[in-house]
């Protein structure tokens, strides 16, 4: 998606440890018009008429997933990273390693809101190694739901997470795949 790549070129930064900082428009301060364009782009790739829920992980994927869900006319569900007192029923859970936070976290989804009748589109703002998305896939499988696809706004292609999903046969679309990121800027792979 050329518009997204241009925003990354113009406003993105690379921090030590290959951290790609796009928080000025994607995952801290959010450009909602850009997210609408991203949702429209995903709708060109995925059959949104089949989807019954959009799933993401807490926290920075929530804004994009919400706009996608609103456009597709379905609920948005996010996996929590901590159990709260307001979850009464059983939980689906998956333990994953967070690249950003450098620690293991447990993704939690209430069994009340995800079941075998659901057709799920996983949406996330960012993918590095793909562990968080794999945790969401595991939760979908545990629920017996049908995974319709995975949509990622920005993928760090040099970390291999997206390549694993492409090889898996799961419908997968990343809109901006960063092949290289350094002090000289960004190089994108054909998405």
What are these model-derived regions, one by one?
Residues 124-142:
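Active-site/ligand-binding-proximal alpha/beta "capping" segment
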Residues 2, 6-7, 18, 137-191:
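PRPP-dependent phosphoribosyltransferase catalytic core
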Residues 51-58:
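Short glycine-rich phosphate-binding loop at a beta-alpha junction
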Residues 63-72:
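Short Gly/Thr/Asp-enriched flexible loops that form oxyanion-binding sites at enzyme active sites
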């Amino acid at each position: 998606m050329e518009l997204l790549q241009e925003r990354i070129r113009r406003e993105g930064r690379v921090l030590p440890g290959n951290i790609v900082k796009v928080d000025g428009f994607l995952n801290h301060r959010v450009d909602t018009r850009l997210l609408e364009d991203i949702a429209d782009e995903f709708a060109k790739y995925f059959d949104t008429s089949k989807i019954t829920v959009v799933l993401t992980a807490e926290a920075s994927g929530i804004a994009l997933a919400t706009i996608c869900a609103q456009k597709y006319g379905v609920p948005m569900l996010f996996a929590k990273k901590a159990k709260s007192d307001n979850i009464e029923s059983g939980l689906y859970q998956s333990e994953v390693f967070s690249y950003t936070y450098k620690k293991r976290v447990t993704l939690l989804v209430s069994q009340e809101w995800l079941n075998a009748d659901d057709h799920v589109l996983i949406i996330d703002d960012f993918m590095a190694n793909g562990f968080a998305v794999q945790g969401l896939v595991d939760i979908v499988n545990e629920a017996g739901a049908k995974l319709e696809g995975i949509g990622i706004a920005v993928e760090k292609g040099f970390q291999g997470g997206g390549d694993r999903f492409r090889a898996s046969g799961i419908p997968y679309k990343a809109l901006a795949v960063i092949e290289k990121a350094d002090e000289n800027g960004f190089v994108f792979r054909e998405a």
